[in-house]
Amino acid sequence: MIVMRHGQSEWNRLMTETGRDPGLADPPLTAAGLAQAHAAVAKLADRRITRIIASPYRRALQTATPIAQARGVGIEVSLLVRERKAYSCDVGSPKSEIEREWPDLDFSHIPEIWWPAENETTPEVRARAEQFYARMRDAEDREYTLIVSHWGFLLGLTGESFENGEWRKLKEL
């Protein structure tokens, strides 16, 4: 399984510049973030990818889209790989809005308001990551699956920090 953090978002850019939460809900990728997403197409070219699972946040879907298009693979949207709720960027867009932006993706299993109302604790994020890990352990195509997710979730899953646009091959499940 390959795990990847989304490209740089407007929230990431502003937070880096100011050191303060800029108050942006579900921010899009910056030009640099879009470039990171397109660069991933080339960087992952030698990897076999037959399945892509992404978080429903706009920044994850924008990162996954060029990879999916280059591979001719659909994107599965999963709430399990969403970001932990901690900052303004972790407030998502309503399902009806993201369905309009990505009409070819299946959001039928996601409620209109799908992000948590309260901030998540580290143990809660780890439990969600463990649930996802257990589910993937039984997936026959896990070795050829790309997960496009977020810093907090990937930290809970791997115990490691990821930069924007960074990907790694996860050790065998």
Tell where the protein language model's regions lie, with residue ranges.
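Short catalytic/ligand-binding loop motif for oxyanion handling, primarily in non-cytosolic enzymes
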Residues: 10-13, 60-63, 84-87, 116, ...
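Short glycine/proline- and acidic residue-enriched helix-loop micro-motifs
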Residues: 23, 104-123
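Active-site-adjacent alpha-helix immediately C-terminal to a catalytic or transition-state-stabilizing loop
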Residues: 69-72, 130-173
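A short, structured active-site edge motif that brings together acidic residues
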Residues: 73-89, 110-116
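Short, surface-exposed amphipathic charged segments that create phosphate/polyanion-binding patches used
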Residues: 89-97
